[in-house]
C-alpha cells in the first residue's frame, strides 16, 4: 500500500487533504528527508524545520500561479519532495540528480535559484514588479453593450 507521500504526484493534490492527512504527510516527509540525508548528506536540521510551513504553503497557495521565493535553498527539501521530486529524491547531491539547492532548471516550481541568505526579499520584489509590468488586456467583443 502506498504511503500518503507516495500518492502525491502534484502539489495541488495537497489542497484536498484534511488536517489529519496533512499531519501524516508532514511526518512522512520528515522521515523521507531523514532517510535520504542520512545516506547522501545534505541539510537536515534546516529542512526539518520547514516541513510544516511547506505543507501549509502548498495547502493554501497554487504555485502553478503563485510564486514562492525561498531565502535559502537548504530549507526547501520538503518543497522539492512535495513538488513532484519525491521519487528522485534518493539522487540528492549526485551528478545529474536532485540538487541540494533550488534550481529553475530542475523544476518549474523552483521560481528562484536560492542559495544564500537574504536574497528572497529583493527577488520577490523584482518578481512582483515584473508581474505588474505584464498587464492582462481583455479584448472585449460585443459584450460591452450588455454591461
Where are these regions (language model features)?
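Cofactor-binding active-site loop characterized by glycine-rich and histidine/acidic residues
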Residues: 43-147
Amino acid at each position: 500500500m502506498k504511503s500518503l507521500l507516495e500518492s502525491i504526484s502534484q502539489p495541488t493534490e495537497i489542497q484536498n487533504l484534511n488536517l489529519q492527512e496533512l499531519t501524516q504527510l508532514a511526518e512522512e516527509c520528515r522521515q523521507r528527508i531523514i532517510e535520504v540525508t542520512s545516506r547522501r548528506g545534505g541539510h537536515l536540521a534546516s529542512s526539518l524545520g520547514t516541513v510544516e510551513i511547506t505543507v501549509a504553503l502548498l495547502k493554501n497557495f497554487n504555485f502553478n500561479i503563485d510564486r514562492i521565493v525561498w531565502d535559502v535553498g537548504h530549507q526547501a527539501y520538503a518543497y522539492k519532495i512535495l513538488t513532484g521530486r519525491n521519487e528522485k529524491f534518493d539522487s540528492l547531491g549526485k551528478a545529474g540528480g536532485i540538487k541540494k539547492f533550488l534550481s529553475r532548471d530542475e523544476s518549474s516550481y523552483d521560481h528562484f535559484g536560492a542559495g544564500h541568505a537574504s536574497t528572497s526579499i529583493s527577488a520577490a520584489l523584482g518578481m512582483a514588479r515584473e508581474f505588474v509590468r505584464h498587464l492582462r488586456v481583455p479584448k472585449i467583443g460585443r459584450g460591452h453593450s450588455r454591461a
